[in-house]
A protein has these predicted regions:
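A cross-family phosphate/adenosyl-ligand binding-site feature
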Residues: 1-48, 56-146, 150-154
Length: 154
C-alpha cells in the first residue's frame, strides 16, 4: 500500500502553498512534519512555490525574515508578498500576490520546462475551512468560505 504523503510528493511537478502563513513558514524552516501538507513537502524533491500572506508586522518580524532566508537557502521559491490593503484593513507589505500573478509565474515555470506540453495539465486545488482536532470529538475551525480557492480554479 502506498503511503499518502509519499505518493503525493511524487505526483506533483511543483507544489504551490497559497497562502503561506508565518506559522507554515516557521514549520518548514525547522523541518516540522506534523500534518499532510508538511510531510508532503519534506518528502518531496520537487520545487515548492510559497505565496506569503500575512499582516505587515508579521511579515517584517525578525523571526519571519529569518525563516524566509532559511527557506530561500533550502531552495524554496517565493512570489510576493505585495504591498497593498490586507484583510485586516491595514496597508503594507504582506498582501498575497494575485491569482493572475501566480498563474503567470506558474505558466512561465512550466513553459521553461516543457512540462505542460508533455502531458495533460492537472492541478489539485483545496479550498474551504480547516479543522484542527483537539480530540476525536472536538475541533477548532475557521469560517473560510473557500472563495480564494474557487477563484484560483477558474
Amino acid at each position: 500500500a502506498e503511503i499518502d504523503h509519499i505518493a503525493l510528493s511524487r505526483w506533483a511537478d511543483i507544489i504551490l502553498v497559497m497562502p503561506t502563513t508565518a506559522n507554515f513558514m516557521s514549520k518548514l524552516s525547522i523541518g516540522r512534519a506534523e500534518d499532510l501538507a508538511t510531510t508532503v513537502l519534506l518528502a518531496s524533491d520537487k520545487d515548492v512555490l510559497l505565496v506569503p500572506a500575512m499582516n505587515v508586522r508579521m511579515w517584517l518580524h525578525k523571526a519571519t525574515q529569518s525563516n524566509l532566508k532559511i527557506l530561500q537557502d533550502f531552495g524554496y521559491l517565493f512570489i510576493g508578498p505585495e504591498k497593498g490593503e490586507m484583510a485586516c484593513g491595514e496597508f503594507g507589505e504582506g498582501k498575497m500576490s494575485s491569482p493572475r500573478q501566480i498563474f503567470a509565474y506558474l505558466k512561465n515555470y512550466f513553459d521553461k520546462r516543457d512540462i505542460v506540453k508533455e502531458r495533460n495539465f492537472k492541478a489539485l486545488v483545496t479550498a474551504g475551512p480547516t479543522r484542527e482536532y483537539i480530540d476525536p470529538i472536538r475541533y477548532i475551525s475557521n469560517e473560510s468560505s473557500g472563495k480564494q480557492g474557487f477563484e484560483i480554479d477558474y
